Amino acid sequence: VDDVICNTLGAFIGSTSLLIARAIEKSRERVRHTNMTLTTTETQFLHIAKAAISGGDLPAEKVDWPAIFTLANQQKLLPILFEAARATPAAGENAALFAVTKQQVIGQVLNQTVRSAEFADLYRKLRSAGLHPIVVKGQLCSRLYPLKDHRISADDLYISDAEFMACHEQLLANGLTTDTPVDELATADEVSYTKNGSPLYIELHRHLFDSSEDAHDELNHFFTDLKPIEVDGFSTMPPHEHLLYLLLHAYKHFVRSGIGLRQFCDIGLWAWEYHDEIDWQRLHEQCESVHAATFAAAAFRIARDYLGIEFDLPAPWSDAVDAEPLLHDSLCGGVYGSNDLTRLHSSTVTLNAVKASRTGAKSSVLRTVFPKREYLERRYPYLKKRPYLLPVAWVQRIAHYASEKQSGTDNSASGSIKLGKERIELMKRYGIMD
């Protein structure tokens, strides 16, 4: 270990000098993201999505269907959009493209159908074992869509700390496996599970939001005293709390690297279905207390104006917020901002800035390049047992960025910092930061 430290610290010092110089150079640049308007393809995509979700006519003008289907796939909305598009004259005019896309859609829907059935069966077994997991998102949102298995998603379970390990053991007993090391199970906020030969994918949550993230831990207190209800055989949050969770879950991912259009669909359909069971005044106060009220108002506007989901938005909510920049960012980023590595890496910049805004501290480029140990523990598990190896992790992270740049992909560290700064301006627009 001592040799590793010595060798690595030498590289670390050299890398630090270069990065500080680069940070100074970049700080002089005043590049800002000015084009936050929707492109023609994005506008057409939204028109088709609105028709698919809420009914109505498809665009009369010429549509770039390969681009539309690519965007739909990135947004995990391909089956939903294809269902609306396949009955149009365009299907005959683009027969080869529609035939290939149809096979892709059939595969996705069949996978989702199997996933849904296996999850329902597994959930019954967990309840029979005396456990009380709460279902969030997933099938509870899917049932609100015209065709529920056309909404492609995994499944999430929220369970008390007291039952977490027992639930883990039951999942293993039912053939699921996890990559999370055994010594991390006792403290992990969430653990992911898959099943060999099955499309089943489950995230088991001890906390709904990462308790180690200063920017998100404050969200957990809303869900500490839930009174679950039964919906379609699943134990879940009451409608008000579930809508709050959908909004804050979207907010969390927006702050990190981005969210997709499907999250706005979920939010809108939930608000429409359970409108009279929502305490809209309290919801606004809750969102406002965590700097999420303007973001939530934009989410509601997207659902109503761009997706055609009709529901009243009582005072003090306002629909005057400009939602187009948020929409553009969502369509560029894909589901959870996963379209490219640059966007994913930029989360270090945005999270650092949000944390700084909460504490009154100043956001730092160096903190972005050299983040705290807690941020790196998931990627570099050895930090949990050997926190003094943090400089080693920094160097490994820098080397990882360098290898990505050499591979020819546009996801360098400087690119991530630039995108992060652009997204910080977007967060200021929606009141997340001052």
Q: For each predicted feature, which ranges?
A:
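Conserved NTP-donor binding/palm subdomain of two-metal-ion nucleotidyltransferases/polymerases, i.e.
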Residues: 31-153, 159-434
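Membrane-interfacial segments
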Residues: 21, 25-30
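Acidic Asp/Glu-based divalent-cation binding sites
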Residues: 3, 155-156
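Alpha-helical transmembrane segments that form the membrane-embedded catalytic/substrate-binding core
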Residues: 1-18
